Amino acid sequence: MTTRIERPLSPHLQAYRVTLTMAMSIIHRITGVALYFGTLLLAWWLIAAASGPGAYANVQAFTSSFIGRLIVFGYTWALLHHLLSGVRHFVWDLGYGFKPGEREALTWGALIGGISLTILLWIAAYAIGGGR
């Protein structure tokens, strides 16, 4: 007969208070998955561009609709957020930014930077006539 050994249990997720850094780590993973599916849409656009005017017009009709622009806007944000969050992880890999204040500053920088760069990129795209 085997003897049961009482081992300590790992704390459940409910034992932790969710911090911004934890939430951003989860969002980094989610944006990575979103980029995978968004890249399929990008490939669809490139294949349509190579296939001819009819196929390209179909893709343009979708991406110029409200839902299409919302998806492209989300893809842009996911790309820029994932990029900046990746830089944050790279800084950590170098051994910097682990103090609570530094960690929070990097996290806020990635969050605000991703949103700001997305908005600036879309403003620039519309300014040069990309939003026709």
Show the residue positions of the predicted features.
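Membrane-embedded alpha-helical bundles that constitute the cytochrome b-like, heme-associated redox core
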Residues: 1-132
